[in-house]
A protein has these predicted regions:
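Domain-level signature for soluble enzymes in the chorismate/prephenate branch of the shikimate pathway
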Residues: 1-177
């Protein structure tokens, strides 16, 4: 099983490993570092590559070093090409984004300005359209890195996918769903 090395990616891979072993299969986790993991000083939109989190996984699938790759569906390209297919999906978490912060007083509807970190082009566009009083900053890195940056005051809050926040146990930081 090929996967990225973040805590969230490993959580997902170990979850699949348990399911496979329960069905009688043997499995081994192989950690693969991707371009998206290595280049942290630029916005994803500036890296200029499709599959920034999947390309290295795909290479190892093609050359037989791994048999399957476990990955978040949100990072997959919409067209996988002829060489790959999605063979399974796990039960889906809630699909919404959540705002997380240590400051429970923040309110996006208050009209008061504050700084939100995210790396998603979709989330940035949504925030700018619906909450123009907020400042949005690019915030790259895995979930733990983003939480650390929040704690270091790089931003006041983070806009993240509920699934990752839930799986990594950061429920107490959710201030808006």
């Amino acid at each position: 099983i090929g996967t990225r090395g973040s805590k969230l990616a490993l959580w997902q891979a170990y979850y699949i490993e348990e399911k496979l072993q329960a069905a009688g299969a043997t499995a081994e986790i192989i950690i693969i570092e991707t371009k998206g993991d290595k280049i942290l000083d630029r916005a994803l939109s500036k890296i200029g590559s499709k599959g920034v989190f999947t390309e290295e996984l795909e290479e190892q699938l093609l050359d037989g070093r791994i048999d399957i790759a476990v990955h978040s569906a949100k990072d997959l390209q919409s067209d996988l090409g002829d060489d790959f297919e999605v063979i399974a999906f796990t039960e889906r978490e809630k699909i919404n984004d959540v705002l997380v912060s240590r400051n429970k007083e923040l309110d996006v509807h208050s009209g008061e300005p504050f700084v939100i970190g995210t790396s998603s082009t979709r989330r940035i566009a949504m925030l700018r359209a619906y909450f123009p009083h907020l400042k949005v900053v690019d915030m790259r890195g895995n979930l733990q890195t983003r939480i650390r940056k929040l704690d270091e005051n790089h931003c006041d809050a983070l806009l993240l996918a509920y699934a990752g926040v839930h799986r990594m146990g950061y429920h107490d930081m959710i201030i808006h769903e």
